[in-house]
Amino acid sequence: MTNQEVEKKILKLTLKKKWFDLMKDGFKKIEFRTPSEWIYSRLLDENGNGRNYDEIEFKNGYAKNAPSFYCEFLGWDIEEHPTEYIFGNEKIITEVGTIKIFLGKVL
């Protein structure tokens, strides 16, 4: 493997169709996740340090041939206050502690 062929680090997440479509079309630039052992195992290493990803792969469902797309991974944060977000015609109100994953451009 040459320096130019460095393997990309990809965070893989599954979405429901309405959120998948809003993200794929560029309207929703934040993915919200309820805190859980599973999501923290993806975002933190065994020492509790944040993992770095190059991209996120979003799939609509769990089937092997489920629709998918990639976007840039810009980092993540934890919601400190209940906040209202509007994406297209959809409204989300987050709770304190909700994990926010920030998306860059769709690739």
Regions found by a protein language model. Give the residues of each.
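Structured alpha/beta reader/binder surfaces that contact nucleic acids or chromatin modification marks
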Residues: T2-L107
